[in-house]
Amino acid sequence: MGKALEGIRVLDFTTMAAGPTAAAMLADYGAEVIKIERPGRGEDGRKFPPMVDGESLTYCWFNRGKKSLAVDMKDPEGLELVKKLIPTAQVILENF
């Protein structure tokens, strides 16, 4: 039996805890969640302790089941990529 949100695409522009948790719950129910992050450093939640082998376990939990895409939206090519992704999504999450 399929999950309730299979076939739904979510673009996740959230950071830290509340937004990523909401997006993770959508992934838990079968949505395809694509997390958009800054290139080079990702989102600040990657620094939350506890750390294991240089990776934040908290970040891993908040972002379970997601795909990750590093995009520089200040770069015209990066912005164009995001503009092309937006119409393919049924849900867009942000918490800026």
For the regions a protein language model found, what residue spans apply to each?
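N-terminal helix-loop segment corresponding to the beta1-alpha1 unit
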Residues: 1-96
